[in-house]
């Protein structure tokens, strides 16, 4: 099931709704993907270090229960929250992370963004930038798994103001360059990109016999 949330969405209520959905689901609960475009916010994961918040300015900061460091969400970025039953699908964490990355890479390829790839030791999706082909981040991952149920998900930069990323060390990496699809010469509607990403995510989930989605 794919569900679009009200745009722009405040981060904290969406996070709490994910937690409530996860706490209330059972073995037969269908998987869902929630798509949204957030109001500007910095989020700090469980490993987040305050020193990676360089200059937050007026943008609110929310500490949350996903893995990872600090990132930015805001208008022009589509976030796909993946409420998936990993135990039912028979997926381990590493396989699940790869599934998220593959879905983002496939979506970028679908819309004509060239060269999307992984970067060893740095989760997320990257694209080559400039003559030297330096890898710049275009999609970030953050997950939480509770009793075999996953929530949080993947954020893909479509066409956004990238300047707030200068106020942080994105994902804890000093000097990491962040880009969006528009910077790669591809301007597409955020809803279209989000829908394709969600479809790829759901299609990639192994579905045991008799399961519903």
UniProtKB/Swiss-Prot annotation:
Its main location: cytoplasm. GO terms for biological process: protein modification process. The active site is at 171 (acyl-thioester intermediate). Residues 27-209 form the BPL/LPL catalytic domain. Transmembrane segments: none annotated. It comes from the Bacteria. GO terms for molecular function: lipoyl(octanoyl) transferase activity. Keywords: Acyltransferase, Cytoplasm, Transferase. It catalyses: octanoyl-[ACP] + L-lysyl-[protein] = N(6)-octanoyl-L-lysyl-[protein] + holo-[ACP] + H(+). The record marks 137 as: Lowers pKa of active site Cys. Pfam families: LplA-B_cat. Pathway: Protein modification; protein lipoylation via endogenous pathway; protein N(6)-(lipoyl)lysine from octanoyl-[acyl-carrier-protein]: step 1/2. It is found in: Cytoplasm. One of its GO terms (cellular component) is cytoplasm. The keyword Cytoplasm applies. Substrate binds at residues 66-73, 140-142, 153-155. SUPFAM superfamilies: Class II aaRS and biotin synthetases (SSF55681). Its EC number is 2.3.1.181. In the reaction, the free carboxyl group of octanoic acid is attached via an amide linkage to the epsilon-amino group of a specific lysine residue of lipoyl domains of lipoate-dependent enzymes. Belongs to the LipB family. Catalyzes the transfer of endogenously produced octanoic acid from octanoyl-acyl-carrier-protein onto the lipoyl domains of lipoate-dependent enzymes. Lipoyl-ACP can also act as a substrate although octanoyl-ACP is likely to be the physiological substrate. This is Octanoyltransferase. It comes from Bordetella petrii (strain ATCC BAA-461 / DSM 12804 / CCUG 43448).
